[in-house]
Design a protein with these regions (language model features):
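Hydrophobic positions on the alpha1 helix immediately C-terminal to the Walker A/P-loop
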Residues: 13
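Small-molecule kinase domains that catalyze NTP-dependent phosphoryl transfer to phosphate-bearing small molecules
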Residues: 113-116, 120-122, 128-198
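Amphipathic alpha-helical oligomerization segments
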Residues: 194-213, 218, 236
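ATP-dependent NMP and nucleoside kinases share a basic, alpha-helical "lid"
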Residues: 81-87, 92-94, 98-139
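P-loop (Walker A) phosphate-binding loop of NTP-binding proteins
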Residues: 5
């Protein structure tokens, strides 16, 4: 999962990861946290191909409105997307097992602390893309004051506690070519960690220390384990009957 300010290079990094995954016999699938939000916007006639400002304003307003009703609303929608992917894959495999390839799910818009927590729940690798000293497009635009930018801006201005919620931080402050070289140098390491389910080894918090004994030995089972973790999380979130 990739975090960072708007237009810092998150989607670009997601595209490069997808290319690497495809070239290494994985099936890459980009599933943004905002996928369900964008679908709702499209139903109302708002897309990136229409008025960009109106599209952004609608998405930010709808996103905030639903989070006010339930802070985890979009996280739950994301989990539903992953479950649907898994169910579709299982149906396809029953018809033709030869089509199987390990999936790599890439999320290019991790913007809130509860989204990082959701990433940890499914043992996802998390990367923060920092602008460093580079000035971003529309640096002082009003839309950058929206709550969806707050986490990334806090990290950029020195909030170490939030930055430490991510496994990696990469600076995109030079040319795109330089950033690509920096990212590509990490891909082998990232995919090894994912395949071996060793992400807990990057963190020394009490939770990760205690869970190291439960790593998956079989990388082929990672997608199935993600589903099990999501289901367990949903079961734990349900209110208990009295």
């Amino acid at each position: 999962m990739i975090g960072g300010q708007a237009r810092v290079g998150k989607t670009t990094l997601a595209k490069w990861i997808s290319e690497y995954a495809y070239n290494n016999k994985y099936t890459p699938v980009i599933v943004p946290f905002a996928a369900a939000l964008k679908e709702e916007a499209a139903k109302k006639g708002y897309t990136k191909d229409t008025n960009q400002e109106e599209y952004r304003e609608f998405c930010q307003t709808l996103g905030s409105t639903m989070r006010e009703q339930d802070p985890d609303y979009w996280v739950k929608e994301f989990r539903n997307k992953i479950k649907k992917l898994y169910e579709e894959e299982q149906t396809a495999l029953k018809a033709d097992p030869s089509i199987w390839h390990e999936k790599v799910i890439i999320v290019d818009d991790c913007r809130y602390t509860n989204e990082i927590a959701a990433a940890r729940d499914i043992r996802a690798l998390t990367v923060f893309v920092s602008a460093g000293e580079r000035e971003l497009p529309e640096e002082f635009a009003e839309w950058r004051t929206h709550e969806s930018e707050a986490l990334a801006i806090a990290i950029e201005t020195g909030n170490k506690q939030y930055e430490d919620m991510f496994h990696y931080t990469l600076k995109n402050e030079e040319t795109e070519a330089a950033f690509k070289t920096k990212c590509q140098a990490k891909f082998d390491e990232w995919f090894h960690l994912l395949a071996e389910s060793m992400l807990d080894a990057l963190c020394n918090c009490e939770l990760c220390l205690s869970s190291r004994e439960d790593r998956l030995p079989d990388g082929d089972a990672v997608f199935k384990e993600i589903m099990e973790l999501i289901i367990d999380k949903e079961d734990n979130d349900k209110p208990t009957k009295t």
